[in-house]
Amino acid sequence: MEKKPYEIKIIQKKAKYHPDPTIVFNHICGSQKQTLLLETAEINKKNDLESIMIIDAALRISSERNHSVQLTALSKNGENILSILKSNLKQKVQMFIQDTSIRLEFPHFQKNLDEDKKIFSLSIFDTFRFIMKFFKNRNKVQKAMFFGGLFSYDLISNFELLPKLKKTQKCPHFCFYLAETLLIVDHQKKTCLIQNSLFTKNSHEQMRVEKRGREIQKKLEASLNSIPVRQEVKNSMLTANMSDEQYCSIIKKLQILIRKGEIFQVVPSRKFFLPCSNPLSAYQKLKKSNPSPYMFFMQDKDFTLFGASPESSLKYDDTTRQVELYPIAGTRPRGRNMDGTLNLDLDSRIELEMRTNHKELAEHLMLVDLARNDLARICEPGSRYVSDLVRVDKYPHVMHLVSRVVGTLKPELDALHAYAACMNMGTLTGAPKIRAMELIAEYEMEQRGSYGGAIGYFTDLGNLDTCITIRSAYVEDNIATIQSGSGIVYNSIPEDEVKEGINKAKRVINAIQHAHHLV
């Protein structure tokens, strides 16, 4: 018999506001693992909007292999969640119990299920639903249960039958932290809030968590230290997993399949490697040189992931039940004079050329259509529409063609159903999506890991906000992997697509090089 949901206790404290969240993160978290910084900014003005930090996590929830989830308690607070799961899930999934962790094994998906049955099949995403089911947020406090982290590109193999690929990194299929201590910074109001979530009635644990909140409050009253500059790395050579010629050859082979009508579009990618012993400093450089709507720094026990992404993945607002996709396809450099200043006339001519380029428009409209199809599967009939079509977003160094597709999520579905139905985003795969992903697997021959997945958060109130993991670096054993791709259509020029892929990676590469004094 299942117990009644346990009520979450929320402890909130106001704290001193600081404008630079990267320095705050360094000051509070340092090299502490299972920490996360998420930032949002306005597209046009590039003003910071909100920063959210997971300073302490109660649980680390990860899927290291298909249909398997590992839940590890990081505090007594988290251990209570595991004890509740242990006594309530035995009949639902296979469970393997250790001292401070649980492994859940889920059934493999059945082949040839229709879409409706498939979306409701038991899956690794039900791990989060189980946790949320056993806890009650009576006062509807925002972010009371806050799951922040990463969906990898390869997560799709839990939901679709795709070729098995070589795993070259420790990056899990997903990795999320359930926040115990959050720092919520509103840059418009210049406020800072410490929020602790208690998932246990243990008085000693409550005292510990309250003390932790006071410690952070006190730390924020002190002057903040700048991010330390580390010594230069010895081997600074940039390498790649394939040459320009090899990448160009793959593009040409995929174009043959496009001409045969097997696919309409595909997004092959390649990896660049660079030593990176100071990821937070590199992230700070990237933020300054390339401010973006979504910026993130994730510090896990196995890896560090940071980036500045221009592209929303999937966004869902439970209040309105609106689900949103934001395809970006079409990129040009900003028009600048020789001295680096903006040339408004040149900039407008570059924008006009991009807006009227047949190849760019064909690629972009295919992806808008793909987004419409993705939402049609999960939205109420007649609610899906294109709210913005072929708009231009401008950043310091590049401009993009963007559109926005929205709809009303069916009442029986939640944000995780929506993400499962829409991943991976068409701008990182192609169309038709499944065949494009099969071809990507065939030609790239190894897992993508974080690249092309999504990073962000979802909450017990049902909201979800994620961005596509691009313009990013995945750092493992002090080596950064920077991955970039190009959208290939019938009339793409392979040599131009090679250059576009390099240009996309350059901003992150330059940030790492500047942080380590390599340039």
Curated annotation (Swiss-Prot):
Residues the record lists as binding chorismate: 330-331, 451, 471, 485-487
Pathway(s) per entry: Amino-acid biosynthesis; L-tryptophan biosynthesis; L-tryptophan from chorismate: step 1/5
MF terms (GO), sorted A to Z: anthranilate synthase activity; metal ion binding
InterPro entries xref list: ADC_synthase (IPR005801), Anth_synth_I-like (IPR019999), Anth_synth_I_N (IPR006805), Anth_synth_I_TrpE (IPR005257), Chorismate_C (IPR015890)
EC number: 4.1.3.27
EC category: lyase
Reaction equation(s) it catalyzes: chorismate + L-glutamine = anthranilate + pyruvate + L-glutamate + H(+)
Keyword list, A-Z: Amino-acid biosynthesis, Aromatic amino acid biosynthesis, Lyase, Magnesium, Metal-binding, Plasmid, Tryptophan biosynthesis
Required cofactor names: Mg(2+)
Binding locations of Mg(2+): 363, 500
Residue numbers binding L-tryptophan: 40, 293-295
Subunit structure: Heterotetramer consisting of two non-identical subunits: a beta subunit (TrpG) and a large alpha subunit (TrpE).
Family under the similarity heading: Belongs to the anthranilate synthase component I family.
Name this polypeptide is given: Anthranilate synthase component 1
